[in-house]
């Protein structure tokens, strides 16, 4: 795991998120500090929770050999942070960094999500210390993967020649509002230090917290010393660094943000090792829409507090103590199952940058970007501002790219589809792309976007094929059909395709936050893919006439795009930038932009100075021009565009948009790539091609989700070296020194679109699936030794696939997989032997297709073995 190890300055930007799915998180810093306390139902980037930290000490015969805070050297800035009086810039590094107390000289951070490990070394400390941290991440187990907790194990190895008594301590400042109360409890032999405040359980601001251990030799200090100036930290360190257990301290009256410490003492013989487990849990049950002012009317002249809803985790656990006890009681199972996933993922024979990208961006699911609503449904921001979510509403045109959730937690992805069609679909078939909270709020007033609305059709198709649940599809189909037919509806003010040509000509809102006018392969591709997917779903739902209609429109559009939008090298936008009349059709009803603060008023799409339409692509080479084909390849939909044209376009994206150094690239937009860093820009205009005076926004940026999809699409089409180079360019930028490896940015931190990286896994394995027909297949990228191993996951099960020149093993680690047919990358027609749990199965072979004739069920823990002759 050398590739995922960070030392020295390469650990300075690390904040490794520890928390549940939609439950909030806190961050483990690169040298051991606890940062980014995002546990109060909103982001809190850069936050510290007082003097919260871990510490260790070593004693022999009543004499303290050494005591240290369990972290490394403080990281810049050393002159101070922020502008607060007496503590900001000019007052030195914040005391809360714990940099003023003895700490370890060297640290080494090893990250392989969902686990992080830090190794601490100091010549003065008699022992080798490590801290391992995780939160359960178990595919398909949404409940245990949503526990609001951070799990920590401190392991100490005595490498000396005498027995040593070690103490491991965990300190947390009580973050509850109101007068804070800290109380130690014992539950079934587990020690729980519960932190609460003055608010009642039904108060919208209520929260309680707990730190707990199942270790022996426990001592607790419920309260640090209450004093002035620097008294509390100073007295604490005197107490901890003295021989023996921490002295207890209690106060009869509630305090304000009191610290509490829980410790455990272990005796370790020479050459021995001991571990102490701690868990920190939180319970902040009540959510509200803090980003928009909402007040319920209680009668004339009166207002009520904003409406609230509960976090999903609050329906599982009554308080933080309950989740702490559950976490400790189930720790072994939760850790073992998380390690099963981690080992399967990291056992994949993928290039290191690809494995890095896939694994690191799974952490987005554990960040404050994600929420789970009271019934367990999933909801997502686009990303995070420093102290609030960024861009609300499970934004469909952003979450289109996020491929992790539908394969790892497919039930949660299906909940996104269900909420979208239930709450966003309008009477005319149009769908706003942002879901409003609380559920049932008035729909967004902004116009539908092409990629978001029609991408939703592709996602319904994907979820249907991943799970094989046609009954689920039938329930959604009437709404899905209405959303497709909105394209030619007379009620569509944007006039996407009023004549049913298969090509979108009208006003086209999209994920780059503006409108295109005129046909382009990028957005028309979504339309074509939705028509093709819609036809297949219509057939499955007993609607053959609709299916035939969709296919006819699809074929017309596909032919037109190939003939009119491909310039011989790549796909362009067909538009006369000098024709102001294009805008005239959209000045009437529906031309407004209410609901999106950043949106461009209709009258501002014309530049008088340049005599041109603004925010268009024209003859540019766009990174997303064949995006719909990427989706289609991943979900088994087949060709949307001419395959030869698609491959030429992909080669053009690599040749024109990928830069090995950004030093000489002019970028007036946001800076995600600097100096000699490599990256792939959104658009380029090759020599001889007309560049709009004011092109589409973000044109020169390097946005990672787009980079990943382009890279994955190259890999899917055999351009593996080029695709890996693009992936490596992104991950090299997140090296721990310049940026946090577990926080990819776009419109904010922990950005959802970066989960396009998960699709790299399926691209390398060549995963093919149709659980409706009980089919699974793999066509992996060839390796030097002809052997390939990779993690896979579908709705019913997850596991590993191993493929060699003439043998393959399909292993189910969790769940149960029923298949009738399997495809492998083998040619020929030789004999085949298929074994399951020691029993040979009948099988008919046609080249690389192995047909079992009946459903074959691979149970949990079993493997299907296929051996073929030449």
Task: Report the location of each language-model feature.
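Beta-strand-rich N-terminal accessory domains
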Residues: 1-79, 345, 358-361, 365-368, ...
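The feature captures the catalytic groove of carbohydrate-active enzymes
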Residues: 143, 151-153, 221-225, 234-237, ...
């Amino acid at each position: 795991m050398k590739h995922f190890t960070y030392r020295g300055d390469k650990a300075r930007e690390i904040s490794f998120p520890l928390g549940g799915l939609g439950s909030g998180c806190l961050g483990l810093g690169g040298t051991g500090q606890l940062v980014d306390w995002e546990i109060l139902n909103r982001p809190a980037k850069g936050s510290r929770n007082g003097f919260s930290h871990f510490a260790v000490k070593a004693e022999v015969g009543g004499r303290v050999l050494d005591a240290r805070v369990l972290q490394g050297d403080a990281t810049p800035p050393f002159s101070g942070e922020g502008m607060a009086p007496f503590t900001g810039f000019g007052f030195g590094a914040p005391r809360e960094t714990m940099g003023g107390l003895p700490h370890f000289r060297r640290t080494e951070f090893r990250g392989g999500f969902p686990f992080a490990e830090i190794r601490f070394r100091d010549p003065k400390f008699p022992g080798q210390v490590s801290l391992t941290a995780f939160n359960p991440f178990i595919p398909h187990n949404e409940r245990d993967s949503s526990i609001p907790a951070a799990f920590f194990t401190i392991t100490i190895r005595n490498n000396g020649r005498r027995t040593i008594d070690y103490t491991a301590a965990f300190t947390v400042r009580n973050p509850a509002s109101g007068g804070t109360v800290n109380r130690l409890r014992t539950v079934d032999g587990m020690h729980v230090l519960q932190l609460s405040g003055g608010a009642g359980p039904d108060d919208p601001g209520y929260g309680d917290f707990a730190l707990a251990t199942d270790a022996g030799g426990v001592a607790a200090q419920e309260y640090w010393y209450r004093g002035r100036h620097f008294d509390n930290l100073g007295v604490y360190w005197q107490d901890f660094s003295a021989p023996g257990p921490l002295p207890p301290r209690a106060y009869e009256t509630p305090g304000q943000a009191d610290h509490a410490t829980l410790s455990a003492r272990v005796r370790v013989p020479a050459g021995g090792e001991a571990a102490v487990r701690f868990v920190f849990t939180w319970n902040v049950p009540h959510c509200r829409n803090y980003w928009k002012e909402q007040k319920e009317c209680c009668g004339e002249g009166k207002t009520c507090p904003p409406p609230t809803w509960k976090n999903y985790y609050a329906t599982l656990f009554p308080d933080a103590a309950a989740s702490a006890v559950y976490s400790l009681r189930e720790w072994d199972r939760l850790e073992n199952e998380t390690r099963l996933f981690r080992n399967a993922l990291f056992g994949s024979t993928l290039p290191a940058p690809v494995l890095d990208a896939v694994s690191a961006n799974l952490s987005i699911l554990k960040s404050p970007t994600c929420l789970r609503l009271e019934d367990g449904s999933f909801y997502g921001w686009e990303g995070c501002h420093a102290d609030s979510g960024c861009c609300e509403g499970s934004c469909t045109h952003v979450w289109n790219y996020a491929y992790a959730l539908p394969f790892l937690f497919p039930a949660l992805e299906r909940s996104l589809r269900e909420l979208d069609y239930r709450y966003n679909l309008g009477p005319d078939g149009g769908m706003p792309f942002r879901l409003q909270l609380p559920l049932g709020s008035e729909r967004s007033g902004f116009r539908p976007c092409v990629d978001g609305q029609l991408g939703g059709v592709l996602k319904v198709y994907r979820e249907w094929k991943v799970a094989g649940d046609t009954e689920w599809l039938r329930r959604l189909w009437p709404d899905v059909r209405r959303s497709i037919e909105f394209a030619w509806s007379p009620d569509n003010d944007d006039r996407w395709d009023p004549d049913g040509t298969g090509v979108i000509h009208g006003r086209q809102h999209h994920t780059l936050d503006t409108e295109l006018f005129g046909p382009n392969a990028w957005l028309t591709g979504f339309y074509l893919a939705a028509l093709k997917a819609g036809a297949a779903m219509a057939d499955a739902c007993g609607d053959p006439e609709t299916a035939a209609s969709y296919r006819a429109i699809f074929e017309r559009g596909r032919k037109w795009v190939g003939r009119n939008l491909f310039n011989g090298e790549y796909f362009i936008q067909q538009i006369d930038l000098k024709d102001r009349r294009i805008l005239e059709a959209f000045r009437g009803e529906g031309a407004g932009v209410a609901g999106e603060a950043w949106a461009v008023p209709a009258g501002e799409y014309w530049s008088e100075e340049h005599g041109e339409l603004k925010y268009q692509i024209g003859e540019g080479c766009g990174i997303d021009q064949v995006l719909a084909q990427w989706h289609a390849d991943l979900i088994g939909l087949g060709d949307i565009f001419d395959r030869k044209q698609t491959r030429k376009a992909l080669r053009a994206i690599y040749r024109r948009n990928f830069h090995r150094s950004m030093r000489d690239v002019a970028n007036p937009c946001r800076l995600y790539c600097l100096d000699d860093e490599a990256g792939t820009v959104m658009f380029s205009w090759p020599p001889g091609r007309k560049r709009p005076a004011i092109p589409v926004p973000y044109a020169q940026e390097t946005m990672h989700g787009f980079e990943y999809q382009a890279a994955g699409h190259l890999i899917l089409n055999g351009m593996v070296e080029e695709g890996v180079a693009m992936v490596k360019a992104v991950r090299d930028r997140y090296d721990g020194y310049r940026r946090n490896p577990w926080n990819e940015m776009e419109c904010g931190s922990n950005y959802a679109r970066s989960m396009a990286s998960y699709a790299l896994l399926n691209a390398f394995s060549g995963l093919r699936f149709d659980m409706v027909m009980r089919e699974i297949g793999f066509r992996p990228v060839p390796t030097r030794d002809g052997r390939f191993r990779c993690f896979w996951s579908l709705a019913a099960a997850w596991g590993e696939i191993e493929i060699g020149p003439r043998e393959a093993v399909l292993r189910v680690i969790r769940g149960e997989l029923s298949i009738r047919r399997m495809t492998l990358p083998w040619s020929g027609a030789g004999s085949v032997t298929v074994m399951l749990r020691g029993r040979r199965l009948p099988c008919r072979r046609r080249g690389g297709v192995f047909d079992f004739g009946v459903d074959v069920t691979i149970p949990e823990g079993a493997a299907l073995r296929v051996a073929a002759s030449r």
